[in-house]
Amino acid sequence: MNYFELFKFPPTFDIDTAVLADRYRELQRAVHPDKFANDTEQQRLLSVQRTAQVNDGYQTLKDPIRRAEHMLSLRGIDLSHETTTVKDTAFLMQQMEWREALEDIRESIDHQAIINELYDSFAAYRLKLTKLLAAQLSSGSDEDALLAADQVRKLKFMAKLQDELTRIEDALLD
């Protein structure tokens, strides 16, 4: 299913999330199972299916990584079950530095300084990747679509690093 069509958006990476939320509420009102309580069993089941599609579409378009994956899947590039790793040497080196910094947090006297520095570093790198991803997705070329897939892989890795940093921070606060 093309969620951009469902929510009446052009298939572009940059979308207005406030408009997305408004359209989500409109679609929810239109397909909500309560509206079909007195209809046939088939109509009620169809309503439940459509509600699930609307919910999944909203969650997909709301999240930049999932939105990019959806855009790529519409172009025949499915990243949902892949095990391809990032081959960018500079990114792999940066990844090792971040991993070492994560390991150093617990032994550090000033935990919060390292944590804040990592949050800032992650945010800056994600912003850079996201801008590059948006440009690659908008180009329309097959080569750029493959490059965009690499950016998505990197962003997924960044999300995992962010989660790991948050877990470490939470553990230190306990």
Curated annotation (Swiss-Prot):
It holds the Pfam family HSCB_C. One of its GO terms (biological process) is protein complex oligomerization. Keywords: Chaperone. GO terms for cellular component: iron-sulfur cluster transfer complex. Residues 2-74 form the J domain. The keyword Repeat does not apply. CDD domains: DnaJ (cd06257). Belongs to the HscB family. PANTHER family: IRON-SULFUR CLUSTER CO-CHAPERONE PROTEIN HSCB. This is Co-chaperone protein HscB homolog. The lineage of its organism: Bacteria, Pseudomonadati, Pseudomonadota, Gammaproteobacteria, Alteromonadales.
